[in-house]
């Protein structure tokens, strides 16, 4: 005997006004099925489920400081991947500069008579560290509000209020809590945050 899911559950349409009826009950918001997504990448009012990398980055910057509505998991994670890729070159410059400073400091410390030519950090190491740090600061400031906004909208897609983002400020466990919330699948009830 095989299992028939349609027979196991009421496969008929719910009655008029039943909470599970799409478009009915709960004020006609349609919480009964899967979450409603954007039909076009240009529709910024709804999340774009299955967004490509390019679509997610465009939507990330077009919704620069929009804290209303929802963002899909693909939009959220591709936007964070983009920011991570932007930070690679400045982080490498910064790390090389710090490494050069550390090497010159260890050479100076290893010379007991102070006769080493490398008595301090070189100009190149200072320049690399400064350039890398400044670039990371500029990029970080440029994407601070968009990252906060997309995190806020991603929480909405999981039916969590946006201010739950501030749980990430709890030392030790806050980042893990927010990470778990961002991984959660979308919930139809999150449509209450749509504009």
What are these regions (language model features)?
Residues 2-82, 148-164, 180-195:
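Membrane-interface extramembranous regions at the lipid-water interface
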Residues 4, 13, 40, 111, ...:
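Serine/threonine-rich low-complexity intrinsically disordered regions
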Residues 7, 20-23, 37, 106-124:
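Gly/Pro-rich, low-complexity intrinsically disordered segments
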Residues 29-36, 122-125, 135:
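Short hydrophobic/aromatic-rich motifs at helix boundaries and adjacent loops
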Residues 44, 48, 53, 65, ...:
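Non-transmembrane, interaction-prone segments in cytosolic or luminal domains
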Residues 75-102, 125-151, 158-184:
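Hydrophobic alpha-helical transmembrane segments in multi-pass membrane proteins
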Residues 98-110, 193-195:
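Short, surface-exposed, charge-dense and proline/glycine-enriched linear segments
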């Amino acid at each position: 005997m095989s299992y028939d899911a349609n027979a196991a559950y009421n496969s008929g349409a719910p009655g008029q006004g039943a909470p599970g009826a799409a478009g009915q009950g709960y004020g006609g918001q349609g919480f009964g099925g899967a979450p409603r997504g954007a039909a076009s990448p240009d529709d910024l009012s709804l999340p774009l489920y299955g967004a490509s990398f390019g679509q997610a980055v465009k939507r990330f910057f077009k919704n620069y400081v929009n804290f209303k509505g929802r963002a899909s998991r693909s939009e959220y994670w591709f936007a964070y991947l983009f920011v991570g890729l932007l930070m690679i070159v400045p982080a490498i410059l910064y790390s090389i500069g710090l490494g050069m400073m550390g090497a010159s400091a260890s050479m100076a410390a290893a010379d007991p008579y102070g006769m080493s030519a490398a008595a301090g950090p070189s100009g190149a190491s200072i320049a690399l560290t400064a350039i890398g740090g400044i670039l990371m600061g500029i990029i970080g400031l440029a994407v601070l509000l968009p990252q906060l906004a997309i995190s806020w909208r991603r929480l909405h897609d999981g039916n969590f209020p946006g201010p739950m983002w501030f749980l990430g400020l709890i030392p030790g466990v806050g980042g893990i809590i927010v990470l778990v919330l961002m991984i959660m699948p979308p919930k139809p009830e999150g449509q209450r945050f749509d504009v």
